[in-house]
Amino acid sequence: MRAGRFAVAGLVAMLALVGTGSTGRGAEDRVQFRDPLTDEPLEIDLPPDATEAVRRFHETGENPYQGDEAAIANGRELYNRWCASCHMPDGSGRLGPSLIDDTWQYERTDTPLGQFEIIYAGGTGAMQPFGQRMSQDEILKVIAYTDHLRQQQQ
C-alpha cells in the first residue's frame, strides 16, 4: 500500500514536470537570448515589474507592439531621444547602419528578438548597450517604431 502511494506521487510529480514543459510556461521554454556578436547565451532576466508585452516577448520572441499605433508613437519619441543621432531621424543611418533596408550586419538582427538583443546588449563600434538606459518595454516600442519606418520605405 505504501509503495503504491509513492508510485502514484512519483507519477503525479513526473506528469506535472512534463506538463510544465508542454505549456510553454516553464523557464526552459522561454526565449533563449544570445549575444549578437558572439552568439553566446545572454542573460536577460524578466524584470519584476514587467509589462504584459515584455512577458509575452520573453515567452515568444515576437514583439507584441508591432502595429500598435500608441506604442509606435511612444517608440518614435524614444528613438528620437536615443537612436536618431546615429541612425538618423528617418532610420537611413549615419554612424550606425540603416534600419530601413533589408541589409543586416548580424544574422539574428532581422528578427525582433535579434533587434532586442543588440539594443539591450550593444554591438560593435558606437552601438552601446541600452539595457540599463531603457526598460525592456521601451526597447520593444523602439523596435515597433523602426519596423514601422522600414514598412513605410517599402
Q: What does each of the following model-derived ranges do?
A:
Residues 95-100:
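Short cysteine/histidine-rich zinc-coordinating motifs and their immediately flanking basic loops
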Residues 9-18:
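Bacterial N-terminal signal peptides
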Residues 52-55, 68-90, 105, 113-121:
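Sequence/structural segment immediately N-terminal to covalent heme-attachment motifs in c-type
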Residues 21-74, 109-110, 131-148:
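Periplasmic c-type cytochrome electron-transfer domains
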Residues 92, 148-154:
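Inter-heme linker and motif-flanking segments adjacent to c-type heme-binding CXXCH motifs
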Residues 1-10:
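Bacterial N-terminal signal peptides that target proteins for export
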